Swiss-Prot record:
SUPFAM superfamilies: Glyceraldehyde-3-phosphate dehydrogenase-like, C-terminal domain, NAD(P)-binding Rossmann-fold domains
Source organism: Thermoanaerobacter sp. (strain X514)
Keywords: Amino-acid biosynthesis, Arginine biosynthesis, Cytoplasm, NADP, Oxidoreductase
Major enzyme class: oxidoreductase
Protein's pathway: Amino-acid biosynthesis; L-arginine biosynthesis; N(2)-acetyl-L-ornithine from L-glutamate: step 3/4
Protein name: N-acetyl-gamma-glutamyl-phosphate reductase
The encoding gene: argC
EC number: 1.2.1.38
Molecular functions per Gene Ontology: N-acetyl-gamma-glutamyl-phosphate reductase activity; NAD binding; NADP+ binding
Catalytic reactions on record: N-acetyl-L-glutamate 5-semialdehyde + phosphate + NADP(+) = N-acetyl-L-glutamyl 5-phosphate + NADPH + H(+)
The organism's taxonomic lineage, starting at the top: Bacteria, Bacillati, Bacillota, Clostridia, Thermoanaerobacterales
Gene3D superfamilies tied to this protein: Dihydrodipicolinate Reductase, domain 2, NAD(P)-binding Rossmann-like Domain
Length: 344
């Protein structure tokens, strides 16, 4: 059994980790930390976990966590995971960070876009945790930087096109996210009266997931990729629907595009390529680790429109983190994640 600890267990990504791991046949949850709810059972904070995980939440205790765990998930604000990772690596414990601390190849880019500063990677070997690209590297990794939710939806949607040189490197992305993406801390923007029957753009052209997208897309393309990104908050709890507008380098029809995607992702269980004329919907992936991808060719403007849907808390966060854990420990990748989406 893989012994697991979670720092930041009571945020949305933390509790989603517990939901998935509590039914994982190869995992034992040994340690859960929370600054806000320590000494309280997690099932008294989230009654959905009653009988599945009733473990008592504890204060942050590095030594205890590392004496009992094989892997630690950090579901903390940016800037807090590096210290934990350093101590864990010394003791041979693996770390999967759901924040942004280990997503960037260049630490200066992290400092430019994120407020939580720390003293760099300092020799920590980290891997960007998108299995569909870095599976072999993840197998050997000690520290994995779990991708952001928006970048996951965008990179998976665009990767076959960039790999095959079908589109140009200037891409427009429009994404809609459920309010759980804003986290559990209360704010005016995620109040019911502000979100209900309302959809609004935010952080236009300056969202901090932009450099993460550009970093990974550029590596796939072999040239610089620039992304014009507009995220929106939609009146739903979960889900991301990303629409990507790409200029074609040559004439291509939608059936050929389908064949390219179907071949590219034929071995990827969690990627579902929809047939021409069918488009992704967030409800079709709700509560699951799947990514649905669809597309359309606008011949009039020589534009390929790609759409992808994920659950922001699962494939966009905690599910992908568990997928990475499975790979790191040689466990079948689907274990604990072979969940049929909830519909309606």
């Amino acid at each position: 059994m893989v012994k697991v600890g979670i720092f930041g267990a009571t945020g949305y990504t933390g509790v989603e980790l517990i939901r998935i791991l509590s039914k994982h046949e190869k995992v034992e949850i040994k340690y859960l930390s929370s600054q806000s709810y320590n000494t309280i059972a997690i099932s008294n904070v989230y009654s959905s976990l009653l009988g599945f995980c009733d473990k008592v939440l504890e204060e942050v205790d590095f030594e205890r966590a590392m004496s009992e765990c094989d892997v630690i998930f950090t579901a903390l604000p940016s800037g807090h995971a590096a210290k934990i990772a350093r101590e864990a690596v010394k003791k041979g414990i693996k770390v999967i960070d759901l924040g942004a601390d280990f997503r960037f190849d260049d630490y200066s880019i992290y400092k430019e876009w994120y407020s939580g500063e720390y003293d760099g990677y300092d020799g920590i070997k980290r891997v960007y945790g998108l299995p569909e690209i870095y599976r072999d590297d993840i197998k050997e990794a000690q520290v994995v930087g779990n991708p952001g939710c928006y970048p996951t939806s965008v990179i998976l949607g665009l990767m076959p096109l960039l790999k095959n040189g079908i589109i140009e490197g200037k891409i427009i992305v429009d994404s809609k996210s459920g309010v759980s993406g804003a986290g559990r801390s209360p704010s005016q923007n995620n109040m019911y009266a502000e979100c209900n029957e309302n959809i609004k753009a935010y952080n236009v052209a300056k969202h901090r997931h932009i450099p993460e997208m550009e970093q990974e897309l550029s590596k796939i393309f072999g040239e610089t990729v620039s992304v014009v990104f507009t995220p929106h908050l939609a009146p739903m709890t979960r889900g991301i629907l990303s629409t990507m507008y790409c200029k074609l380098k040559k004439d291509i029809d939608v059936d050929t595009v389908y064949d390219i995607y179907a071949d590219f992702y034929k071995k990827e269980y969690f990627i579902k390529v929809l047939e021409p004329g069918h488009y992704p919907a967030t409800k079709s992936v709700y509560g699951s680790n799947f990514c649905h991808i669809g597309f359309e060719v606008d011949k009039r403007t020589n534009t390929l429109i790609v759409m992808s849907a994920i659950d922001n808390l699962v494939k966009g966060a905690s599910g992908q983190a568990v997928q990475n854990m499975n790979i790191m420990f040689g466990i079948d990748e689907n274990t604990g994640l072979d969940i049929v989406p909830i519909y309606p």
